[in-house]
From Swiss-Prot:
Membrane topology: Single-pass membrane protein
One cellular component term from this protein's GO annotations in UniProt: membrane
Binding-site positions, Ca(2+): D168
Boundaries of every TNase-like domain copy: 114-275
Gene source species: Coccidioides posadasii (strain C735)
Protein name: Probable endonuclease LCL3
Assigned protein family: Belongs to the LCL3 family.
InterPro entries: SNase_OB-fold_sf, Staphylococal_nuclease_OB-fold
Segments of this protein annotated with the region Disordered: 1-53
Record keywords, A-Z: Calcium, Endonuclease, Hydrolase, Membrane, Metal-binding, Mitochondrion, Nuclease, Transmembrane, Transmembrane helix
Amino acid sequence: MKWLFWASPPQDDSNSNSGAASQVKCRNNENVDVPAPSNAAPPSDRTISKVQSSSRDWNSIVNATDWKQFTEPRTIIPTALVTGGILLCVHIHRKYLRRIPEAGHISPSFFRRRSLLGKVTSVGDGDNFRMYHTPGGKLGGWEWWRKVPTGKNELKNRTIHVRLAGVDAPELPHFGRPAQPFSQEAHSWLTNYILGRRVRAHLYRPDQYGRVVATVYVRRWLFFRQDVGLQMLKHGLATVYEAKTGVEFGGVELERQYREAEACAKKKGKGMWKALKGGTKGEWESPREYKTRMAAEEGQKKNARGITRKK
């Protein structure tokens, strides 16, 4: 009711809906839609800078880097020295300082080319023993930084079984076989000579018993090292190893020295040669003859058992 003076005048649609689009009449009486202004705030300078930085050309960054500094001798030489030093340390550790736990872990490339330094932990017989590999010796930290285990549980599966090359000592009782004369003397001598000492074993080959055949040296007096097998021959507590196959001396020169030492001990009647020098040739038996006789007797016993079972 327009005549009522208190009536409110009609509101402008453009003010009531500011977000809606408006129409403008052009001269040719055509209506053109004009988008309404946005209520969003204008972007800040920080937003603009982020957008600009994200769209930056990375090629320009690479080109802007001064790569000449990486080709200068003052950069290349130290880098090459550090890299080469690291690779050299890794090579030395893998080849010389890595500990070998057992004979089965020795690489075939070691045989006749390399030697192992270790500490003797036990002596099993007159011509074999076990040693704990200590690569590098004292320079590798052993004895003052790294300790060699002493307990049986600690040493289990962690020692190398070594067979002395070129010699054969009297047999101790084992596998049901009786002890051979002078076997205890040979075992006691070897125990006193090398047990608890550091030895160096020059490796030749593995044998059928899981041992490694080697010429072993021990330092008894200052810097003078002694061939353990050769010393046993000189004391008459072993013979030169005699077999049809598998004989290992480590060279013609060592074999010559071994045979001369055996002949000298035999002539002087030392150790096990006492019985032979005393004229009891029939009672004397070499370790090789003893093994052959024991094998023959065991074979006869097996054959006798087989015949008895058939009956």
